[in-house]
Every structure is written in structure tokens, then in C-alpha cells.
Design a protein with these regions (language model features):
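Nucleic-acid substrate recognition interfaces
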Residues: 1-439
């Protein structure tokens, strides 16, 4: 207790493990004819994928036995229009997308309930009225401090909030029905791009530009890796010389032959030696081909599972110096700390200016800041980077209802929290292991 208030509970620190996968990207430089063939293959497989996804949503949740039977039947049916390997990738991706949709509905329900709880607590009060003092009001289930709730500033604001509360309740009912029925709402190509079609006047796209983006986002050019096969993938293969070969679906063999070979060789820059070692060892490598219509560029992504080193124990990391990091809206404040938590040397400020930038630019700025943190940790021989888990995911669920209006109320949303995902259920310290050379 401090002045009658319950302080925020500090959670136990956890060590974030190293990533268990690798993904690298390079450009493809196809000719006009090869680009046309890639588009035709992607559009055909995309159409098949969307049809299978719609059918899978209609089946609702399946147990293990029923799912195995469904996938075997669909793979056999799809082989006639694609190939056995394309059919395997499509059915696997369909199931992954369905499960992701179900998890998204469950997460959406949790966010709606949190927002409704906040609105209900304030809407029951008259404008300007203070909630009565109650022991249950001092702290919530997450252990955070809670002030006495106050009613909204005016009757007009309260009326607006009651309308929003009714809308959220309606959305919650719809989401709960979708979850119970096992029918998530999935938009292949992205709901944001779909909404842009209905509001083109508010975007910088013409209808033709939107159509190109929409068609590109709905293509399917994903091939799962196969261990023991040449190059680690028989569907999309890249050999040691960089020659890219794509297996043509059965429905397009008459036009493009059994395989489409890209004339210009491809080359990976980042982690190229690891990729080459897997190709030579015939280890599984997954490939994804995508198209950016705004730039007119084709991209090839290679991904595979990695074998990270065991996560070190927390006591082991505490033995040496660590780099403590404080997250702020426009910068990261870092300082080297000894084993007792005392600062060593001068603190460092790393600017992270993301206001007004596109999502891709914001992501680049945050990645650059993380790279500087890793470099600083390496220069100071720090065993780990320690950053507080501020639990911004929970704040975003109820922030519109609790943080108030204007720039002051929304200042907390400027912190680059997506780059520092929470690893625990409650606020606390998140310890990141420093990996030399990782970016």
C-alpha cells in the first residue's frame, strides 16, 4: 500500500527463447512471359485455395480422425487440377488458416469483454458521479491499482458511450455465435484491402490499382519443404546455381509445360550459407512467391526450422552485466546495469521516431533501434537485454475507453511495444537473450 492505493504487482521475470525458424527473402527477375505464367499459376491455385477454405469453414471443427479423413479426400480431389504436392500445401494452409481464424475470434471476444466491462462500470454512474469506495475497487484481477471510477463528463458523452456499449454488445453476441458455430470470418487478401474498395475516395488508389493489389494478395504460391528431396523442395526448387523451377499445376500444363523455369538466377544475401547447406543436404526448405504490383516486383521467400541453443537460466544471466531498456513513445532509454541493478556508465538514448509513418517504415525504424540495442549489448559484454513487459496488448483492448480523449490520452499508444511482445500473462520483466550477429 502507498497512500491508500494498491501498487501494481510486479510479475516474475522470464527469459525469451531464441526463434525456432528462419525466413529470408530475395527478388525474382522474370521475363514478361515468365511473369505472366507466374500470375496464371498463382491465380489458379489461389482460386482452388479459396474454394477449399470456404468448404473447410462450412465443415466446422473436426476431431483428429475426421480431419485426417477430410484432408486425404481433398488431396485426392485437388490432385486432378493441381498436383499431389500442390494439393498437400493447399490443404495444410487451409487448416492453418481456419485454426488461426478460430483463435482470432476467441481473442476478439476477450477484447470485447474487456472493453464492455470498462464501459459498463462508467455508464452506471451519473455524469460526474464518483463510484462508492469498495474494497473490490482497489485492485483488479491483474493486480494493478485502480482509482475510483468517475462518471462521464456530460450527459451527451454518457449517451454516446451507451450507444457504443450497445454496439459492442451486439458485436460480442455475433462473435460468440461465430465461435460456437466454428465459422470464423476470413477474408483472403485482407479485410483492410477489402474495406479500401468501398472507400477508394479516401485512399490514393484507383480502382485498377486496387484490383491489381487485390489479385496479387489472393494468389497462392506456397510450397512446403520435403526432406530427402533434391533441393529440399520438389514443387518450388532452387538449385545451387540459383535456377528457380516451379512445378506447373495440371490445369496449366498445356500452356506452360510441366515446369516453369525462371531464366535469371536468384541469389540470397542474408544467411545464404545456411540456405546453401540445407539445399546440399536435401533438408526441407519452404518457398513462398509473392508479387508487389505497386513496384512491379516478384519476391521469393525461403524458410526452414532452426535448432536454437538451449535457453540459459535466469540466474546465469543475472551473474553478468545486463542492458536495461525503458520503452517510451519516441525513444528507448538504455543503461548497463551490474548484478545488483546499479547503473554502470552513462545512459544511452535511441530515438524511435514513428509518428506519421507507414507501417513498413515504422517497422524498419523499430528494427533499427533493436539492432542498436544488440550492438550496444555486445560492446558492453552484456549477458542479456532486460525490458519491462508493459502489457500494451491489454491496454489496446480497453485504451479507447480508459485513456481519455486527445493527444494526452493516446500518448501511450506511441510506444513501440509490438517489437517487444509479452512473454508472460502479467506485467513484469522480460529478459531477452543477446544473440551475436542477430538482427
Amino acid at each position: 500500500m502507498a497512500g491508500g492505493r494498491v501498487l501494481r504487482r510486479i510479475g516474475d521475470p522470464v527469459v525469451a527463447g531464441a526463434p525456432v525458424g528462419v525466413r529470408i527473402r530475395t527478388r525474382i527477375h522474370p521475363t514478361a512471359a515468365e511473369s505472366e505464367a507466374l500470375s496464371a499459376i498463382g491465380n489458379l491455385l489461389g482460386s482452388v485455395y479459396r474454394g477449399e477454405l470456404a468448404g473447410r469453414v462450412g465443415l466446422r471443427p473436426l476431431d483428429r480422425q475426421a480431419h485426417g479423413l477430410w484432408r486425404a479426400q481433398r488431396k485426392q480431389a485437388l490432385t486432378a487440377v493441381s498436383s499431389s504436392r500442390w494439393a498437400g500445401a493447399i490443404t495444410r494452409t487451409v487448416e492453418d488458416q481456419y485454426q488461426l481464424g478460430m483463435r482470432s475470434v476467441a481473442a476478439h471476444i476477450a477484447e470485447l469483454r474487456a472493453a464492455i466491462e470498462v464501459l459498463e462500470a462508467r455508464c452506471v454512474l451519473r455524469p460526474g458521479e464518483l463510484a462508492p469506495v469498495d474494497g473490490d475497487q482497489d485492485s483488479n484481477s491483474r493486480g494493478r491499482s485502480r482509482r475510483r471510477r468517475r462518471g462521464y463528463g456530460s450527459a451527451a458523452e454518457r449517451f454516446t458511450k451507451t450507444r457504443r456499449l450497445a454496439a459492442l454488445r451486439q458485436r460480442l453476441t455475433s462473435a460468440q455465435e461465430a465461435l460456437a458455430a466454428g465459422r470464423p470470418s476470413i477474408t483472403v487478401g485482407g479485410k483492410r484491402l477489402w474495406r479500401n474498395r468501398n472507400h477508394l475516395e479516401n485512399t490514393d488508389m484507383t480502382e485498377q490499382q486496387w484490383r491489381k493489389k487485390w489479385d496479387a494478395a489472393r494468389m497462392f504460391l506456397t510450397a512446403d519443404g520435403e526432406s530427402g528431396r533434391t533441393g529440399g523442395n520438389e514443387t518450388i526448387r532452387v538449385d545451387e546455381a540459383g535456377r528457380l523451377r516451379i512445378k506447373t499445376p495440371a490445369g496449366l500444363v498445356d500452356r506452360f509445360g510441366s515446369h516453369l523455369v525462371i531464366t535469371a538466377p536468384v541469389a540470397f544475401s542474408h544467411r545464404s550459407s545456411e540456405w546453401a547447406a540445407r539445399v546440399n543436404a536435401r533438408a526441407a526448405v519452404r518457398y513462398d512467391i509473392s508479387y508487389d504490383p505497386a513496384r512491379g516486383r516478384w519476391y521469393l521467400d525461403a524458410s526452414w526450422k532452426s535448432s536454437p541453443e538451449p535457453t540459459p537460466a535466469l540466474d546465469e544471466l543475472r551473474g553478468g552485466p545486463v542492458l536495461g531498456v525503458d520503452l517510451n513513445a519516441d525513444h528507448l532509454a538504455a543503461c548497463v546495469l551490474d548484478a545488483s541493478g546499479n547503473p554502470i556508465g552513462e545512459p544511452t538514448t535511441i530515438a524511435v521516431q514513428t509518428a506519421g509513418l507507414k507501417a513498413s517504415h515504422r517497422d524498419g525504424r523499430v528494427r533499427a533501434a533493436i539492432s542498436r540495442l544488440l550492438d550496444l549489448a555486445g560492446q558492453q559484454n552484456c549477458a542479456a537485454i532486460v525490458v519491462e513487459n508493459l502489457d500494451f496488448a491489454d491496454a489496446r483492448a480497453t485504451g479507447r475507453e480508459t485513456l481519455g480523449r486527445g493527444r494526452g490520452g493516446n500518448a501511450g499508444f506511441g510506444a513501440p511495444s509490438p517489437a517487444f511482445p509479452p512473454a508472460g500473462s502479467g506485467p513484469g520483466s522480460l529478459v531477452w537473450r543477446r544473440v551475436v550477429g542477430s538482427r
